[in-house]
Amino acid sequence: MTTQGKIRLGVPVVEMGQGIYTSLAMCVVEELEMTLDQVEHIETVFHTAFANPVLSYFTNDKLRIQMTGGSTSLMGWGAYYQEIGATAREMIINAAAYKWNEKPHFLKINGSKVVNQVTGATLSYGELSEQAGQISIPQKPKIKKISKFKVIGKPLKRWETLSKINGTASFGADLDLPGILYGTIKHSPILG
């Protein structure tokens, strides 16, 4: 989370038209009571930590690879991203509690702010982001009940669509590294 209160969200799967960037962002903003326009997607590095959870599960961890396909992205990552949002929410609330010297149960979140229900004071997520980064990570954050959902399950515009339309979206073919060499087939050796 930035000091402007935006989320930089890494997604370890490829957006191929299935809407996964939006879906996983929805899982996080649901828990934080934010909006999709407060999310910025960033690329993740290749690492076994980002192995496809569904594929790993069904192969007893024999195939721990980072892969997109088979409709496994949301099934595999959705609950993890909700937990990321819930963890961030609890850390932000705890940062506000520390700043106000107040018990966390007297605080609530509302529109990217923490509200002190005793004094009425508010602090934005941006104001709390650095302090929240110093808070111990909760081991079992409380996930919202389905009945409380405001984002998940609701029709929303996909937040990455504009970048695809205006050409600013980044794809694998856009990779540019210092000294990179590109290769292509000049002419296919066979017809068809």
Label the model's feature ranges.
Residues M1-G192:
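Cofactor-binding beta-sheet edge motifs in enzyme active sites
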